[in-house]
Amino acid sequence: AGSALSGKQTECWTLVTGPEMRALEERTIEARGIPGELLMESAGRALLPSVLALRASSVRSQATIRILCGTGNNGGDGLVLARHLFAEGVASETILMGEVTSLPRDAAANWARLQRLGAPSRVVALDSREIDWQELFTETSVAVDALLGIGLERAIEGGFARLIESLCRSRREGLRVLAADIPSWLRPSH
């Protein structure tokens, strides 16, 4: 049976574009009857072993894990991960970039769950300069990039641009970074 995807075959994986991945997710939700919230739960939980392995190999293994979340479904994946880290007793902090009211339904439900648990979290306005990201990342064992994911169709600017620039700089300096979906500095349409 052939595939409608134009994905590129690699040794182990088929690579797809952002629009193709969105189509696969929609097909899974609609045709197979798997709710979006369950996909989000699976994606967030699947990040846990990799985050813990990266933390163990970090020179700052006892430092806090920072989960950087945007206001889309990719951010929702990060919120699920944050809940699981908190349940495991792992030192972590969730930073939501943007307004809570901008979260889609499934992500908002996960934000509410995280708040009910009392997990360390904060909301940062997109245009905020209140955080010195470079300084914060020196106190971080692993940064989880759940900011933009496959839905990005515009230029990165403002607070996101400053955050991503600091994240890339810190990564070059040794910070462990794990992306949910794809790194925010990559364009998903290619």
Could you describe each region identified by the protein language model?
Residues 2-61:
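Positively charged, low-complexity intrinsically disordered leader regions
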Residues 3-16, 58-190:
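Glycine-rich phosphate/dinucleotide-binding loop and adjoining beta-alpha-beta core of small-molecule
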